[in-house]
Structures are given as C-alpha cells and as structure tokens.
C-alpha cells in the first residue's frame, strides 16, 4: 500500500490525479489519437449533455455506433448545480413553463368566482411547495436521460472535458480523476450560461441569474429583474403572477430581435398587471444592508440622475455567453467568433476542423432554442452515420415567449420584412380580439393582438405570423407548418376556423394596416 501511495505522490509530495485511459483493443486513447490512421475509442463523442447533444448521441447510438457523452455542470457563482439534461431541462424551458403555469393558475383562481366557484380571498401562494414540485419533476427528467443513455448503450462521463488535440479530449471529474477519450467524430454541444455585468460593483456577490431562480428554496420576495431579454420578461411575469413585488430594469428596447410592436404590447400588458418598469436605466452598485436586503443604485440615462431602491433579490437576465472558454479549442484548431466566443460552423454544422461539429446555443448564427438544437443534433447524426444528406432548415422556426400574455411568432417580424422587401411590397393584416374566456371574468384584453406579415403582390406569400394571447405556443405551432410550406394569405383565408377559439381569429384577418380601418374584432360570430 505504501508503494502505491508513493507512486501516486510526485516529488512535491502531493497526490497526482489518476488518469483512466479508455482503450479499444490494446492501444491507449492517446496513442490511437496520435498515430496516423489509428483506431479511435468512439465513433462519436458528444461534449455537453443538453438537449441537442443528447439527441445527437442517442440518434447515433440507434444507428449502431459507439457513442460517448461527456457532461459536467459548473456550479453557478451562488453554488447552484443540477443534473443531466442541460439548460432547458434544469434551468430553462421546463421549470420556467411550470412556474408560468403556477402564475396562470393564480389568475384562473381569481376568475373562478365569476364562473360560480366560491373561492376564499385572498388566495395565498406557497413558493416552497411550488419549487419542490418543480424541482422533483426536473430531477425525474435527469434520471430519465441517464436511463435513456444506458438503454442505448451510450457511455456517460460526468467530466469537464477539454481538447488535447483534434481527436482527443481529457476531462476531470469532481473527485479530481482524469479521463482521456478519443473519437473519430466530435460534437460540441456545451450551450451557454447567463452573463453577469462585471462592471457593476456587487453584481456577482449579491445577484442571481436564471441558473438559480428555479432552485431557490425560499421565495425571492421583492425582486429586481435586470434585463430586457425574453428570460427577463418571463421571469418577471411569473414572479408578478404569484404575487411578488417585481420590477424590471432595462437599458433599451424589450425583446430585441423580436417584432417591436409585439414587444411593446407584451410590456404594456405586464405593466398594466402589476410589473413595474424602469426604462432607460442601468445599475451601478449593489450592496447588502444589515437587514440582508439589497440596496441598488442606478442611473437614469436620459436625465443622468441617480436613484436608489431596496430589494430582496436581484436577478440578472442581460444575456448569455457560450460555454467555450474552457474547452481549449485552439488545441483542436476550432475557430470561434472573437466578439462572442461562439463556434463558427457551416451548413453541415462542421467547424473549421472537418470532423468536429457544433450545435445548439454554442454555434454561431443559430437560434438559441431547444427544438432547433434537438433537430440539428438528430440530423447531424443521420448525416454522419445514416447515409442522409438532409440539412437543418433554420428558416421559419417558430417560438413563444411565455410572458403572462404569451407571444408566439414564426417567420419574419414586420421590421425584417420591410428591410428585406421594402415597405411598398409588404401588406400587414391585423386584429385586436377578446378571448371568450376573458368575457365572463371581465378580463382586460386590450393587448390581445394578431398580425400576419405578407407580400403585397399576389399570391401574397405569408412571411410571418405574430400572435399575442392565451396559449400562443399552441396556436403558433399549427400555423408554422403552413408558413414552412409556403402558404399564401389567400390559402389562410380559405381555411375554416374552429369556433370558439383564439386561433380562429388568424383565419379571419381581413383588415390591413394600409387601409387605416379599425382592427378591433367585435362580436364572436362575425
């Protein structure tokens, strides 16, 4: 035993990490990688255990290939960590949608009395109960992913991987043990993490991000959300919806990259339903008070004046950065965009190194959306191992922002269509409508709005659809198929609606912005 310990110790007397080299046949991984034409350990190695990476790995395994996944979650600055599944499962789509649902249920409970239900008021929300239920569901998904990998004989390594050369990575697990892996093909699918404003004193010490909010055991209380991204507005929306005092501070326009008329309606609805907005403001300092509350100092950019407010929680939602900095990409020869550190890829998802690929949020110019990463991952595996040549189509990708009044869209925004084709060649059909469910409950529907962006010349190809209202994701998904197939305005108008639904208002759009007529829908059977 003493001899083993002595062998593990170097001249410094410290323990060296053990290296476990996985082999195929008699040659080690490092030898296989360095020898020209040497056998590799795996047909495919996926770095990153998020939605895109797992989809790619499972598809390749289904096609009979030897596959490995290397995944490791670096705890957030607040110490939050989670299991296999990536951002969407753990700190994104899934917990966000469930907490959004919790907020919607609060509104339904308030509506219930209008429908004859005798509900004691005021209704109280229990953050602990909600958080525990959401976290338990997330953990079940973590376990499900592990089982799926095992069932498909995908080798899983919980290691922080980085490149040694273009065919080899090494990774360190949380115990400090080093594992070295080689593969013929490597897919980078490491995703991204929330950005901290390092120029704001106290931001890192006292703030949290979307990596933390869904794993809080106690209610965040009075919350300041800093940012104008969809993450900022979604989080602020459900926090307000469950009864918390919530303020959004944003430097410039909300939902940059989305249709700006729709973005304005989203924030108008949130503001009219209790979320406060500090527009054109930037934080400069956060300090913790003796009461454990956070005192935030900010500047109004228009006036140059400073102001101060006190909050229980500050949530940063100012954007995301790709997880590429610790991959040692230069050792593999993989090129990144120096401005944002995203990996440059071609239509095949290939990087500057032909057998190394990148998919999902880490890839330059790709939508940061779970479904696109999943589809791109599956198609990549099919091209590599299934004799397919089908490329991912990144045009007309639908998405939904799960704010209190949901915003679904597919295709071009009005601004994009005008910039691409010119104002004189664009026709926009639009309508304000009131969901039937809002009528009895006497809910405000002034921001429920639809617009369809079309070419003006026949056959009036539909370029984009924008829907603001209940169940926007469900509505948009169906129309996305038509737009992907090249539907015209005339074809949409020939479609019979399902009555009474919100989605039928799309197939009844007949007033154009150019006409100047009132777009408000009156009656329910017109």
Curated annotation (Swiss-Prot):
In its miscellaneous comment, the UniProt entry states: The active site is a redox-active disulfide bond. The selenocysteine residue is also essential for catalytic activity.
Mark the residues carrying the PTM N6-succinyllysine. Answer: 81, 177, 331
Tell me the gene name: Txnrd2
Q: Where in the cell is it found?
A: Mitochondrion
Q: Which residues form a coiled coil?
A: none
Hey, which family's this protein in? Answer: Belongs to the class-I pyridine nucleotide-disulfide oxidoreductase family.
User: Which reactions appear under catalytic activity for this entry?
Assistant: [thioredoxin]-dithiol + NADP(+) = [thioredoxin]-disulfide + NADPH + H(+)
Q: Which Pfam families match?
A: Pyr_redox_2, Pyr_redox_dim
Give cofactor(s), names only.
FAD
Gene3D superfamilies from the UniProt entry:
3.30.390.30, FAD/NAD(P)-binding domain
What is the documented function of this protein?
Involved in the control of reactive oxygen species levels and the regulation of mitochondrial redox homeostasis. Maintains mitochondrial thioredoxin in a reduced state. May play a role in redox-regulated cell signaling.
Q: In its UniProt entry, what is this protein called?
A: Thioredoxin reductase 2, mitochondrial
Its organism's taxonomic lineage begins at:
Eukaryota, Metazoa, Chordata, Craniata, Vertebrata
Broad EC category: oxidoreductase
Please name every pair of cysteines joined by a disulfide bond in this record. Answer: 88-93
| EC numbers for this chain | 1.8.1.9
Q: Which GO terms describe its molecular function?
A: flavin adenine dinucleotide binding; protein homodimerization activity; protein-containing complex binding; thioredoxin-disulfide reductase (NADPH) activity
Its predominant location is mitochondrion
Q: Which UniProt keywords apply?
A: Disulfide bond, FAD, Flavoprotein, Mitochondrion, NADP, Oxidoreductase, Redox-active center, Selenocysteine, Transit peptide
Q: Which GO terms describe its cellular component?
A: axon; cytoplasm; cytosol; dendrite; mitochondrion; neuronal cell body
SUPFAM superfamilies reported in the protein's UniProt record: FAD/NAD(P)-binding domain, FAD/NAD-linked reductases, dimerisation (C-terminal) domain
Subunit organization: Homodimer.
